[in-house]
From Swiss-Prot:
Spans within the Cytoplasmic topological domain: 1396-1484
Stated role: Functions as a sorting receptor in the Golgi compartment required for the intracellular sorting and delivery of soluble vacuolar proteins, like carboxypeptidase Y (CPY) and proteinase A. Executes multiple rounds of sorting by cycling between the late Golgi and a prevacuolar endosome-like compartment.
Residues linked to a glycan: N232, N986
Similarity field: Belongs to the VPS10-related sortilin family.
Cellular location(s): Golgi apparatus, trans-Golgi network membrane; Prevacuolar compartment membrane
Keyword set, alphabetical order: Glycoprotein, Golgi apparatus, Membrane, Protein transport, Receptor, Repeat, Signal, Transmembrane, Transmembrane helix, Transport
One Gene Ontology cellular component: cytosol
Topological category with respect to the lipid bilayer: Single-pass type I membrane protein
Protein's recorded name: Vacuolar protein sorting/targeting protein 10
Coiled-coil blocks: none
Annotated SUPFAM superfamilies: Oligoxyloglucan reducing end-specific cellobiohydrolase
Species for this entry: Lodderomyces elongisporus (strain ATCC 11503 / CBS 2605 / JCM 1781 / NBRC 1676 / NRRL YB-4239)
InterPro entries xref list: Sortilin_C, Sortilin_N, VPS10, VPS10-sortilin, WD40/YVTN_repeat-like_dom_sf
């Protein structure tokens, strides 16, 4: 339910809770409950009010209210007054029974509509009625119910019922499963279709609740007949809304039906049959597009950017009379405040946002944030008299504030709350009121006053020196104004003002009780002399204001001017749209407007109750401004926009609906409903007739068919050289396409549209750099001052925060973010107050508004608790420098005292669910690992790898359930390399995965875990490690089973020109594909792969024995996970993936260029697009981190002048005509296929014990985009595979022998050494006899080859602990259970069998007579069997006899076997020796 009052005024009241002239008749009434809705009937004194689920009515303008008797026993949730039938209103309840009146509430009738009841399970919406302006009997009532989450989406189910007799009879359910339905005649000016026609959007969902198809349906008989309406070039998006505004029917469609934040397309029609796609060139996201008061000849659309939590900005667009072509009228509209002036065509008021002139440190009050003073930018108010084409500042009629001096009036609000339930400027002939201040921009709340204008908003006078809520009566000749507060801001107002001379003078009236005013109501047309002041009166308790009561003041000006009614001489003719007395009125829509209004000083009342203001039209002479482009043409992008050029898409559509083969169209036409006077001129004086042959516009693939490339490029020139950039999100549900960048000029820039445009961050301090956090939207700018600037909305708004300690050169990372809470972060700086500049760590829990000291001496800190499987949200680890200059690790958990964990550490790393600490002990480097933040275990390295204190190690990855770590074994300058280690699942035992892995001098390693594919790793090794001298000779190695086995990439047979490589035919060790790795990348974010483009890899390298120089490389592509490759371009290129791999983009990295190379068909073909009119030096090619966008950014510099950064936005959004069809219920009928990764040496598709299938776009469906289609939901494992060698890796202290692929003990170690090393650990009580193999944690294989069988054994002297751990110790109660209970059961069972099966069948003597060589007891033994129990017992007896005979026979036979034969069998089965240090498994 929307709150009907001015929200700012209400919040002002809430803020306080936290803290002998003519006199009209005033009447006070109080109530316990505030209304949630209040509204007038049109041309009536009757008001409906909803309070606490009860309906109230007043027949006398609010003087008295009484509860509606018909609904007393009902739970009323809302009401709607018919906008077209003045006497009718509908009241909705939470049941299926509702009410309506046809006489303004004098009587009420029931009607039933079996839509969703609000009492049912799930979230049901408040019912809503769709009215028909052409036939009041045709109505639709509907609501919707959403799944348990309650969040509105396409998954919500709508239910529609209709009536053809105004609900006098039972309504009928609409037989259309629609998402939205609208009457074609839901606007009085609409002549679309038939009176009974409805348009509905129907979404077809599959079992996954995905939209498979979205269709526009028209029905002229409420669904009995349904006709599909074709939206021209609509692709396959999802219709989200249908609007009928003025004479336009618009259909709003998401381009990406799987994204709630998709770009929006709008289709417009005036006849309901032919739809044209609007050219609204802006990324519009659902929920941020609104339709403003439109004229008969144009649409006004506002798009609002909600990326900032505190500073929403909007754009205002105006369409031509076709509703297709749009012009941007105003940008950067602050808080979306733009409003058309009532009754005056072409007059608008708007607030614009401009950068602040300074970083003022003055504190804003709470009311400042509510009233605009807390806005992130300065607010400047402007007006337009020419329908938005030009905008000007508001003049103050005071010599102290002149426009020439940059002084003008700026209004925070210029609207009143109408009795219709919406905010308007007021139904007056040019008389306006506003709340604001004067100066260069809107001031603080304490500077705000109330102003009045008598010329439609061009000039203003100071009316009251305090902000007021206002309302107009008697056509603007009575103005009511109630201050927001009393003398003090925290006190209620106990008086109000009124003016009887259009705001020139004011009288003050005292009130019986002070109130915080909410709004002032009067009749819809503003002709009444009665007002209702609605407010609240706080009640004081022991702790201040505790609750509030509703206070109403009924104010009646019935006897004003002694009852005198104005005569003709009391009126004047006023002309609208005149900026001043000397200027001519502006012509809009071909006419000037005049009004007869009362003279300001006349002492009389107009007293024309319910009579709307009349406009006197004065036609203007026709000019070019009265003409616009005809359908089939569009405004030229060159010049002033007056020239019209052919629109191929529109011409194609016109040809499709025309029977003629030739179209003859004027390039311009008179604006619809334009009233200009042609005089002696003709249309040909303004327009030119053009002819088009339809045959030329219907050729498939022809440029004129609308299939031309729709790549859009936007250049931004940014001062300074690019030094840092990053993509950031705005919230968790939105695409992270905000871009923040810093330049060498120490300035920061922000883009909130994916790089299409950039704005400088209005910070005057030098910006040293920025950090982005793990929570979407976190950005912190560091400066050279005592302030930092914090944003939580992707840089849309930065708030200044004072740093608790200054930046220090010894602190490499001054900020540490919390993983999940954006308000928590740690600041580390130097406290120089005592002269020693000691490092100190502080923490904040409120986004930097305040800080508390965390630890003195800390140089690094991290929130680590959230990474563990059982999170400790406030757990922090800090590295502290001790007095001896050694480093120690400390743990701090919330308010607890710091606890030292380790002395003499090198550092720590947080990866996955692990924290790894490097500790120096006994001159060697040891690793400690924790998975819970409390208990640390030793990380045991292979026995042949001794890590000295000076050796470095790098923690690389842990996404596959194991830690990958690189330990440096050669730190010689320019010849650094080391051993790649991999841990078991808890990070305690490490084995050698790959030796001699390349690293650089700062510790970065040539190691890449490929996103999107399990266990695929690429690393570069130093092949000439034995030479121990530079230069390195690198080779690329790939593992497809998570580091267990390594091999070479198979090279492509030919290069990009079709020429065979020289080494073709040589073994892979001499001829393989080698790629430049992590250590050589200019930007470490440029990875081989993308998590969304499954199986796609791009890299720069060469084919040969070794990796050659970077500048001599070529660019290679694989689309099958690296199994096969092809060279796509000769030379070094930057690369990016777009739209989950449907767009592959390359741009030259070494050579100056003006073109981008792209492929839309998985690299089969490549196209070149020129993005610049001159060649530039490209710095980087970028897109969103998820690679799901269809926008790219090229950062470049002019080769001749690198002092500024050139940013090119390359937008492929419109290059695809449709979105790929995804239907997981019918996968054979959509645009996708399943793809499985394979091993080059495997005969099946089993990897890690299962066959996985990933969904990818069909290779031949290159005409569609993927967007946000949830392809991950389609991932499946179709079968579990038997275990093979590839499912195992070497166990601890074992290493793979590449010659025979077996795991052998590390050199110099025996099985006994392994036992010794494991048992020597503190508190160790067991060791394991290993086969040398362990199962890879990622593998899910079952059965097959089992290579990892091992058995735990007790360490010497630890048998007791071993038994206790495995529950093998026998004592006490366990001994009783193990011995006594089985004995009792056995004795009882034996007695029972003897009694029922042996004793009564003759005893043991009888059994002894049975021959054991017969298959049955046919010798006459017939046991007694009276029931089933006897049968079971006798079978046990028989079976016992047979088993006994078998045992005896076996023992006799064993005696005959020669003992030598047993020895031979044992040797054959077990081998000649039982001592082994490897297991030979030839099977791969």
């Amino acid at each position: 339910m929307k709150w009907l009052y001015n929200p700012i005024v209400l919040l002002a009241y809430l803020f306080v809770l936290s803290g002998a002239a003519y006199t009209p008749e005033v009447r006070l009434s109080t109530h316990d409950v505030l209304p949630s809705a209040m509204q007038y009937f049109d041309d009536s004194p009757t008001i409906l009010s909803l309070k606490n689920d009860r309906l109230w009515i007043s027949q006398d303008d609010g003087k008295l209210f009484e509860e509606v008797g018909a609904t007393k026993d009902q739970h009323v949730v809302s009401f709607q007054i018919d906008p077209f039938l003045k006497d009718r209103a509908f009241v909705m309840t939470n049941t299926k029974t509702h009410f309506y009146t046809e006489n303004q509430g004098k009587s009420w009738k029931k009607f039933d509509a079996p839509i969703y009841e609000l009492k049912e399970n799930g979230m049901a919406s408040v019912p809503s009625i769709e009215f028909n302006a052409a036939d009041s009997n045709l109505l639709i009532i509907s609501n919707y119910q959403c799944p348990d989450s309650g969040k509105y989406s396409h998954r919500c189910e709508h239910k529609y019922h209709y009536t053809t007799d105004g609900f006098r009879s039972v309504s009928k359910e609409l037989p259309i499963k629609a998402h939205v339905c609208r009457f074609a005649r839901s606007n009085p000016k609409s002549q679309i279709a038939k009176v009974s026609s409805i348009y509905c959007a129907v979404n077809e969902l599959n079992s996954y609740k995905h939209i498979v198809q979205s269709t526009l349906i028209r029905s002229d008989n409420f669904g009995k007949d349904q006709n599909v309406v074709d939206l021209n070039e609509s692709g396959s998006g999802a219709i989200i809304d249908i609007k009928v505004e003025e004479s336009f029917l618009t259909v709003v469609q998401k381009l990406d039906k799987f994204s709630e934040n998709s770009k929006i397309d709008m289709y417009v029609s005036r006849d309901g049959e032919s739809f044209f796609k609007a050219d609204l060139q802006v990324d519009i996201k659902y929920g941020v597009m609104s339709f403003l008061d439109s004229s008969p000849s144009s649409f006004f659309v506002q798009t609002t950017d909600y990326s900032s939590k505190m500073s929403d900005v909007a754009k205002l667009f105006r369409s031509d009379s076709s509703g297709v072509h749009y012009k941007l009228l105003l940008d950067n509209i602050a808080e979306g405040i733009v409003m058309k002036v009532e009754n005056i065509d072409g007059a608008w008021l708007a607030n614009t946002a401009v950068d602040k002139e300074s970083d003022s440190d003055d504190l804003n009050s709470f009311l400042d944030f509510l009233l605009g003073g807390g806005f992130a930018k300065d607010i400047v108010t402007k007006f337009s008299f020419d329908d938005g084409d030009t905008w000007q500042l508001l003049k103050l009629n005071n010599e102290k504030c002149k426009l020439a001096d940059g002084c003008s009036v700026h209004l925070w609000s210029f609207s009143e709350y109408s009795g219709k339930g919406k905010f308007v400027t007021g139904p007056t002939p040019g008389i306006l009121m506003g709340i604001g201040s004067e100066g260069k921009h809107l001031g603080k709340y304490e500077e705000m006053n109330t102003y009045v204008s008598r010329d439609g908003g061009a000039s203003w006078d100071l009316a009251i020196d305090t902000p007021c809520v206002f309302s107009f009566g008697d056509q603007g000749n009575i103005i009511m104004a109630v201050p927001y507060h009393g003398v003090k801001q925290e006190s209620p107002a106990n008086y109000f003002y009124f003016s009887l001379d259009q705001g020139l003078s004011w009288e003050k009236v005292e009130l019986e009780k002070g109130i915080f005013v909410l709004d002032i109501l009067t009749t819809l047309d503003g002709t009444s002399r009665k007002f209702l002041i609605e407010g609240v009166k706080p009640e004081e308790g022991k702790q201040g204001y505790t609750r509030a009561k509703e206070v109403q003041y009924f104010v009646d000006f019935a006897n004003v001017h002694d009852g005198k009614v104005c005569s003709d001489s009391d009126f004047e003719e006023w002309t609208a749209r005149k900026i001043d007395e000397d200027s001519s009125p502006t012509c809009v829509y071909g006419h000037r407007e005049k009004f007869r209004r009362r003279k300001a000083d006349a002492k009389c009342s107009v007293d024309r109750l319910f009579e709307d203001i009349k406009v006197i039209d004065d036609p203007c002479e026709c000019t070019e401004a009265d003409f616009e482009c005809s359908i089939g043409f569009m405004p030229s992008e060159k010049g002033d926009g007056q020239k019209c050029v052919p629109d191929p898409t529109a011409i194609k559509a016109l040809c499709g609906s025309s029977k003629s083969s030739v179209l003859e169209i004027y390039d311009k036409t008179l604006v619809q409903e334009d009233k200009c006077n042609m005089g002696g001129r003709k249309v040909d004086d303004f327009a030119t007739m053009e002819k088009f042959k339809c045959s030329e516009y219907n050729k498939p693939g022809d440029d004129n068919s609308g299939e031309v490339s729709k790549i859009v490029v936007k250049l931004n020139e940014i001062e300074g050289r690019l030094s840092q950039y990053a993509y950031v999100g705005t919230d968790d549900d939105k695409l992270a396409d905000n871009v923040v960048l810093k330049t060498s000029e120490d300035r920061a820039y922000i883009s909130n549209d994916g790089g299409i445009s950039f704005v400088k961050v209005p910070v005057h301090d030098r910006i040293l750099g920025f950090f982005t956090g793990p929570v979407s939207g976190q950005v912190v700018l560091l400066t050279d001052s005592e302030y930092m600037y914090v944003s939580q909305d992707g840089g849309a708004l930065f708030e200044r925060r004072k740093i608790p300690a200054e930046l220090s050169s010894q602190i490499s990372r001054p900020i540490a973010f919390h993983k999940t809470d954006a308000d928590k972060f740690i600041w580390i700086g130097s406290d120089c107050s005592k002269g020693n500049c000691e490092p100190v760590a502080y923490y904040t829990t409120n986004g930097g508004q305040s800080f508390k000291e965390l630890m003195t001496g800390a140089i690094t800190c991290d929130y680590v608790g959230s990474v563990f499987e059982q999170p400790e949200e406030n757990l922090v680890y800090c590295t502290k420098v001790e007095d001896n200059n050694l480093r120690s690790l400390w743990s701090i958990n919330g308010q607890k005292n710091p606890e030292k964990l380790f002395d003499n550490i090198v550092g720590y790393a947080v990866t996955g669910h692990y924290v790894v600490v490097a500790v120096v002990q006994d001159k060697s480097l040891e690793a400690k690992v924790t998975v819970d933040g409390k208990t640390f275990a030793d990380a045991d390295f292979p026995n042949d790898l001794k890590v000295e204190a000076h050796q470095a190690y790098t923690v690389l990855d842990s996404t596959s359930g194991s830690i990958f770590m690189h330990v440096t074994t050669s730190s010689k300058r320019d010849f650094e390399y080391g051993t790649l280690l991999k841990s078991n699942s808890n990070g305690t035992y490490f084995v050698t995965s790959l030796p001699n892995v390349n690293r650089n001098d700062v510790g970065f390693v040539d190691f890449d875990k490929i996103e999107g594919l399990e266990g695929l790793i690429i690393a570069n090794i130093v092949a000439n490690y034995k030479e121990d001298k530079a230069p390195k000779k690198l080779q690329t190695q790939v593992s497809r089973n998570d580091g267990s086995e390594w091999g070479y990439f198979i090279p492509p047979p030919t290069d990009s020109k079709g020429v065979k490589y020289k080494c073709n035919g040589s073994p892979l060790s001499k001829c393989a594909l080698h790629l430049h790795g992590f250590t050589e990348r200019a930007d470490y974010r440029d990875t081989y792969s993308s998590g969304s483009a499954t199986g796609f890899l791009i890299g720069v390298g060469n084919v040969g024995e070794y990796l050659t120089d970077y500048n001599e490389a070529a660019t290679f592509l694989s689309i099958d996970g690296g199994v096969t490759w092809k060279e796509v371009q000769e030379g070094v290129y930057h690369w990016e993936f777009g739209d989950q791999g449907t767009i592959l983009a390359l741009v030259s990295a070494n050579d100056d260029t003006d073109s981008i190379i792209y492929s839309l068909d998985e690299g089969k073909t490549w196209s070149e697009y020129k993005f610049s009119d001159k060649k530039v030096k490209v710095l980087d090619l970028a897109t969103v981190p998820t690679d799901t966008s269809r926008k790219f950014l090229i950062f470049a510099v002019d080769p001749k002048d690198s002092r500024e950064t050139l940013s090119f936005s390359i937008d492929f959004t419109n290059i695809y005509a449709r979105q790929c069809q995804l239907d997981l219920d019918h996968p054979d009928l959509d645009d996708y296929e399943y793809w499985s990764p394979i091993h080059p040496e495997g005969q099946d598709k089993c990897l890690f014990g299962h066959e996985a299938k990933y969904l990818r776009r069909l290779s031949n469906k290159n005409d569609c985009f993927i967007g946000s289609a949830p392809l991950s939901e389609a991932y499946k494992q179709i079968r579990v595979c038997p275990c093979t060698r590839r499912d195992y890796e070497c166990d601890y202290n074992y290493v793979r022998d590449p010659l025979d692929n077996t795991c052998k003990l590390v050199p110099g170690m025996s099985a006994g050494d392994r036992k010794k090393s494991m048992c020597e650990k503190p508190d160790a009580f067991q060791y394991f006899d290993s086969t040398g193999y362990r199962k890879i944690p990622l593998s899910t294989c079952v059965g097959g080859k089992q290579f990892d069988k091992w058995e735990p054994k007790a360490c010497p002297g630890k048998q007791k602990e071993f038994n206790e751990y495995y529950g093998r110790d026998v004592k006490g109660g366990k001994l009783f259970i193990l011995l006594f209970v089985p004995i009792v059961v056995f004795v009882f069972a034996t007695w029972f069998v003897y009694d029922r099966g042996i004793k009564r069948n003759g005893g043991f003597q009888r059994l002894g007579q049975i021959r054991l060589d017969e298959e049955d007891f046919s010798d006459g033994f017939h046991p007694i069997e009276d029931n089933k129990i006897d049968v079971v017992v006798n079978r046990i007896v028989k079976g016992g006899v047979v088993v006994a005979a078998g045992v005896v026979a076996t023992l006799k036979t064993v005696r005959k076997i020669d003992s030598l034969l047993l020895n031979k069998i044992e040797m054959l089965c077990l081998g000649e020796t039982r001592e082994r240090n490897y297991v030979n498994i030839p099977e791969r």
